[in-house]
Swiss-Prot record:
Family classification: Belongs to the NqrDE/RnfAE family.
Name by which UniProt lists this protein: Ion-translocating oxidoreductase complex subunit E
Broad class of the protein's primary localization: membrane
Keyword Translocase: yes
Membrane topology per record: Multi-pass membrane protein
PANTHER family: ELECTRON TRANSPORT COMPLEX PROTEIN RNFE, ION-TRANSLOCATING OXIDOREDUCTASE COMPLEX SUBUNIT E
Role of this protein: Part of a membrane-bound complex that couples electron transfer with translocation of ions across the membrane.
Keyword Transcription regulation: no
UniProt KW keywords: Cell inner membrane, Cell membrane, Electron transport, Membrane, Translocase, Transmembrane, Transmembrane helix, Transport
One GO BP annotation of this record: electron transport chain
Subcellular location: Cell inner membrane
Chain ranges passing through the membrane: 18-38, 39-59, 69-89, 92-112, 128-148, 182-202
Length: 233
């Protein structure tokens, strides 16, 4: 398997930052009340990861090891500020909905962790791909949790998609369950913890089934001993 495929497999599934490393749980639980909010924050985090990894990798030969962490934080803060201004300019509704959790990307352990563990030691191209894979892995986890909570809580999917994609995206709203009153447990923090637990359990079950399938498909071919080979002849 090539290095690029390994990075994608690690980021999207095997070493998923949200479901395996359990990093960035604060925004994961707080913002995932709807699929739109979850997708918006996930894409913003992915953009920050790609830009940060690219910058850290490009500057890795000139950054003194003694002060590398403060420099990484400054790079991350600069990128996050730029992303925050872009969201404020082009998706103001989403900006208001996400609130403080956009600037809090600066403190997200996923971002500083990938900068230190991978980008500071590898070429620019692979570092950017690592940031993309890790970001999309977190985005997928955020989106699934947000969609699950929105469906169970409000009976809808992609409600408020126009905040992220523009006025045309109102047609994306889907009414799945017709609820007389919202199911508050799914929308409140306890529902976020329960939903995350279900996702973790689901990933564990899938991983175990994949392991069992691989074990069953292994075919061991017994080698004939010399004596058996002579008898066969």
């Amino acid at each position: 398997m090539s290095e690029a495929k390994k990075l994608l497999a690690q980021g999207l599934w095997k070493n998923n930052s949200a479901l395996v490393q359990l990093l960035g749980l604060c925004p994961l639980l707080a913002v995932s009340s709807t699929a739109t909010n979850a997708l918006g924050l996930g894409l913003a985090t992915t953009l920050v990861l790609v830009c940060t990894n690219t910058a850290v990798s490009a500057l890795r030969r000139w950054v003194p090891s003694e002060i590398r962490i403060p420099i990484y934080v400054m790079i991350i803060a600069s990128v996050v500020s730029t992303v925050q201004m872009l969201i404020n300019a082009y998706a103001f509704g989403l900006y208001q909905s996400l609130g403080i959790f956009i600037p809090l990307i600066v403190t997200n352990c996923i971002v500083i962790g990938r900068a230190e563990a991978y980008a500071a030691k590898n070429p620019v191209g692979l570092s950017a791909l690592d940031g993309f894979a890790m970001g999309m892995g977190a985005t997928c986890a955020l989106f699934v949790l947000g969609a699950l909570r929105e469906i169970l809580g409000n009976g809808t999917l992609f409600d408020g998609a126009d905040m992220l994609l523009g006025s045309w995206a109102t047609v994306l709203r889907i009414d799945i369950l017709h609820l007389d009153t919202p199911f508050l447990l799914a929308m409140l923090p306890p529902g976020a913890f329960i939903g995350l637990g279900l996702l973790l359990a689901g990933k564990y079950v899938i991983d175990e089934k994949m392991k069992a399938r691989k074990a069953n498909t292994r075919v061991s071919v017994p080698q004939l001993q010399d004596g058996d080979a002579e008898k066969a002849l």
